[in-house]
Amino acid sequence: MRSFRASIFGLTGLILVPLLACQPLSAYAQAAPTEPTPVQLMMNALANANAAVVGIRVSAADGARSAETLGQRRNGSGVLIGEDGLVLTIGYLLLEAEQIEIVTQDNKTVPARAVAYDLATGFGLLRPLLPLPKEIAEHIVALGDTRELKPGEALMAVTGPQPNNDGDIAMTRLVSKRAFSGTWEYHIESALFTSPPITVSGGNHSGAPLFNQKGELIGIGSLLVADASGADKKQPGNMFVPVDLLRPILAEMQQSGMSQKSRRPWLGVTSSDQGGRVQVLRVSKGGPAQLAGLRAGDVVMAVDGVPVATLETFYKKVWDRASPDAEITLTVRQGDEVKSIVLKAEDRMLTLKKPASI
């Protein structure tokens, strides 16, 4: 079991020292002996947050498409957000899951089931099939608010345990808040980027919770990135999905297994921004793009006649349809030729193998 105090006191330069420097001595002189100091309150809040973190182990179903990129077996982290055992994690861990286990901080496992996967935000929800141990169940974290976060603010990220791996606690700083477009047909407007990067041992950074100094949950770990600052100078770090995106859809996710925004056209392409153009890196086997004749190396120039030069404009134009299975015309450069390729998009959520619980 990881030692919270040993970890936190070794990292006081990020949070505790600045906090102490901001407190006048009179604040401590006037406090009653039994009244907790601001530092003690912060330590208690972060200790509660740390205790709510769990590990997650997933085995994907046989024949799962997602196994090609995510693997058949996946490890990650999650955090308890509900009295009924509801755990929040990053959704790609749960894609086409056949078996899910929660790993407690004393390295015991509890079987779990997927509750939701939200394609639009990337969040995933799960619940244990058996009661969680009391030392975890009594520690539930509140959702914070990232609107007031400022670059440079000290934060705490925690990775969940795995067998033979106790997880880790890392102090990090917010580097930037900005829009993020993923290569896998994904875009959010307000991703959180932190540095230095948190521990990557065993892949536990996937789903790792990010906490503010009040012990409130503000983000869920998605990726390791080489450019956390977004500037020319490379600064390795992590991208977290902000919980601000969860709050308005949490009830819908629990009821329907996803938000309505997840029902959108999917092409089955992995693409990247390449100096003012959108280049296809790969196409999913059997997906709409492959069936229509798109190939790796193609450059997407327009969607339905509207020029696109970034992943963001590409995705938003594709998603601007009333039906997820709409016909879409792509203008692409394929080698030395410019072609118009018509494809029939799919509802990504209908292509995934799902356990009976969703």
Please state what every model-predicted region is.
Residues 10-23:
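Bacterial N-terminal signal peptides
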Residues 27-92, 99, 150-157, 251-252, ...:
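N-terminal activation segment of mature serine protease catalytic domains
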Residues 33-46, 134, 157, 161-162, ...:
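C-terminal cap/linker of serine protease catalytic domains
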Residues 51-56, 78, 85, 89, ...:
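Terminal peptide-recognition signature
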Residues 52, 60, 71, 129-142, ...:
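Active-site region of chymotrypsin-like
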Residues 61-62, 80-165, 200-204, 276, ...:
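Conserved active-site neighborhood of the chymotrypsin/trypsin-like protease fold
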Residues 145-148, 204, 209, 288-299, ...:
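A short glycine-leucine-enriched loop at secondary-structure breakpoints
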Residues 193, 197-200, 252-317, 333, ...:
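PDZ/PDZ-like groove recognition
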